[in-house]
């Protein structure tokens, strides 16, 4: 084994500086090093209707195979575009009206920083550092890209609602929310504290982690994260998730009265813009080339933006006022620990860890690497530890928790390239996109209806990921019972998030108790946290040998029915007749 496949110390002779210089020179000065003999037309050939096309398979590039420089850059850009929508969506939502209610400057900064941090911390996962004199690693050594986690959005929006209602965040005389940098700083600091949980769990055996968090626990949890986010996305699709959506039909205009083209919430124009994005994504999947399929979400967003700009929905003032370049810590936020947020964020980190294990397993599979054994367990350990550290570093870099992205596994499978050089090129493009602040300003200026058409599809893919995880569950009576019980309360909390808001009536001056009650209330308002806790508890206490149903499947039911009809029509007679 070589490189990241090796578990023990690397005993191979190290390359000298001269070797590295000669290798780099060959990459830039020879045809094989620059473009090779790869069929680049494969990436750009669309699937035209009514045209019979010759199917051809591209060569597979393994983890450490030699790959032409141009191809590495091209596939790296494809990876960056595939994850772009997922990276920019959380900061846009958390900086918007459902989050900290920031202005354009802070929103642009968070989008830029999210891209930069994603690029830098993805490189940490790919590089895979060995912890000195231990058997532990930091990182997977695979094309494991990280981005801002969707699991944080639901908890963060609920927390900001609580902060504004309790006076932690300011409101004006009319009750309208004002920017709350203090609340965002509390989210960052509490996230850094809670990231220690994932770092600690990374030193446990991967087999023990899988036993504690099997698919029957992780599947419904991930599904409800996506389901809860789809509601906010649909509000944006119809015009915006701010105050104009809280009481539609009263004359309020979205996104605001001074917008370039304000309309009432739910107007046909808004619905049409979002549908254009949605339809473009479907067309790219049906007729697009391989590179278009992996970037279908971004292509749909681009088409929607072009039409919205032509129809006068874009506000260019933020783009014109934005600086040319940006970087981490251009803006900072006061760091404080918000006690009620600790319990919900601990649940978020459990979900992030479970997602990471599943995504790393999928990456090993599509990269044609072993998915069991010591090497695989080492990758899981390094990936979980790396993810915990990246979450800690992300918080210190003013960004919410990160998680391993699954959509890039589709890029690997589609392009048949699992090479880390393409992954490093992806990191390079993400950092470059983040540094150019005008690019982030253009993303922040995207109309809500266009963004909603994209995020509805994106969040639905999160929910479907949960369904895919649940498909690996054996549908025994025990597992059906666990899923039913955990879904019952979790789905109810997702549909009615304020169901537990009036349970506690304490109004004393014990701030510690008040913070604990607010934390419990915040957990109970997040359906995925309730489902995850119930699923984990029931999976531990219910015995594995629970009595099965007499009829276990549709085939058994049909067979029993046929036998009963042949044996006799009277109840209870079929069994005796068959025996006879």
Swiss-Prot record:
Inducing stimuli: Inducible by 2-thiouric acid, and highly repressible by ammonium.
Entry's Gene Ontology BP terms: purine nucleobase transport; xanthine transport
Tree of life domain: Eukaryota
Keyword presence, Magnesium: no
Protein name: Purine permease
Lineage of the organism: Eukaryota, Fungi, Dikarya, Ascomycota, Pezizomycotina
Pfam families: Xan_ur_permease (PF00860)
Annotated gene: uapC
Function: Able to transport with low efficiency all natural purines as well as purine analogs.
PROSITE patterns recorded: XANTH_URACIL_PERMASE (PS01116)
Keyword annotations of the record: Membrane, Transmembrane, Transmembrane helix, Transport
Cellular compartments annotated: Membrane
Membrane spanning residue stretches: 68-88, 107-127, 136-156, 184-204, 211-231, 263-283, 294-314, 385-405, 426-446, 447-467, 481-501, 522-542
């Amino acid at each position: 084994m070589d490189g990241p496949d090796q578990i023990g110390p690397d005993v191979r002779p190290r390359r000298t500086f001269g070797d590295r210089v000669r290798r780099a020179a060959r990459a830039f000065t020879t045809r094989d090093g620059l473009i090779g003999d790869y069929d680049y037309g494969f990436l750009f050939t669309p699937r035209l209707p009514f045209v019979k096309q010759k199917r051809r398979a591209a060569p597979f590039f393994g983890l450490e195979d030699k790959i032409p420089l141009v191809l590495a850059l091209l596939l790296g850009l494809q990876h960056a575009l595939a994850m772009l929508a997922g990276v920019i969506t959380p900061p846009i939502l958390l900086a918007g009206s459902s989050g900290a209610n920031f202005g354009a400057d802070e929103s642009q900064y968070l989008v830029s920083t999210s891209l930069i941090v994603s690029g830098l911390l993805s490189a940490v996962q790919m590089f895979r550092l060995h912890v000195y004199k231990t058997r532990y690693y930091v990182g997977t050594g695979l094309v494991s890209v990280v981005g801002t986690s969707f699991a944080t959005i639901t908890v963060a929006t609920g927390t900001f609602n609580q902060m504004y209602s309790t006076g932690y965040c300011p409101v004006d005389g009319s009750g309208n929310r004002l920017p709350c940098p203090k609340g965002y700083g509390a989210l960052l600091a509490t996230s850094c504290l809670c990231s220690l949980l994932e770092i600690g769990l990374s030193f446990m055996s991967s087999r023990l982690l899988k036993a504690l968090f099997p698919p029957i626990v992780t599947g419904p949890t991930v599904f409800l994260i996506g389901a809860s986010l789809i509601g906010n996305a649909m509000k944006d699709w119809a015009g915006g998730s701010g105050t104009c959506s809280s009481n539609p039909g009263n004359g309020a205009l979205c996104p605001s009265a001074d917008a370039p083209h304000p309309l009432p919430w739910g107007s046909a124009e808004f619905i049409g813009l979002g549908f254009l994005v949605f339809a473009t994504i479907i067309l790219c999947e049906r007729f697009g080339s391989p590179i278009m399929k992996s970037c279908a979400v971004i292509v749909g967003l681009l088409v929607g933006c072009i039409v919205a700009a032509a129809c006068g929905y874009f506000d260019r003032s933020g783009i014109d006022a934005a600086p040319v370049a940006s970087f981490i810590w251009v803006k900072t936020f006061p760091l404080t620990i918000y006690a009620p947020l600790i319990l919900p964020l601990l649940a978020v980190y459990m979900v992030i860890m479970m997602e990471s294990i599943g995504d790393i397993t999928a990456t090993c599979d599509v990269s044609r690497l072993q998915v069991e054994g010591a090497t695989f367990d080492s990758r899981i350990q390094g990936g979980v530890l790396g993810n915990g550290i990246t979450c800690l570093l992300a918080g210190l870099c003013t960004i919410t928790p990160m998680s391993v992205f699954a959509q890039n596994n589709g890029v690997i499978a589609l392009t048949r390239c699992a090479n880390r050089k393409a992954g490093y090129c992806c990191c390079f493009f993400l950092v470059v996109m983040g540094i150019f602040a005008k690019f982030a300003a253009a993303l922040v200026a995207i109309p809500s209806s266009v963004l909603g058409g994209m995020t509805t599809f994106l969040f639905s893919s999160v929910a479907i990921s949960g369904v895919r995880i649940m498909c690996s569950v054996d549908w025994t009576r025990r597992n059906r019972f666990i899923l039913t019980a955990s879904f019952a309360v979790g789905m109810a909390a997702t549909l009615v998030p304020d169901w537990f808001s009036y349970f506690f009536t304490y109004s004393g001056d014990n701030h510690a108790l008040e913070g604990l009650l607010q934390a419990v209330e915040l957990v109970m308002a997040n359906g995925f946290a309730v489902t995850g806790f119930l699923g984990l508890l029931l999976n531990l206490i219910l015995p594995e040998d629970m009595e099965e149903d007499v009829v276990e499947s549709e085939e058994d039911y049909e067979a029993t029915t046929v036998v009963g009809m042949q044996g006799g029509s009277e109840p209870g007679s079929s069994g005796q007749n068959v025996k006879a």
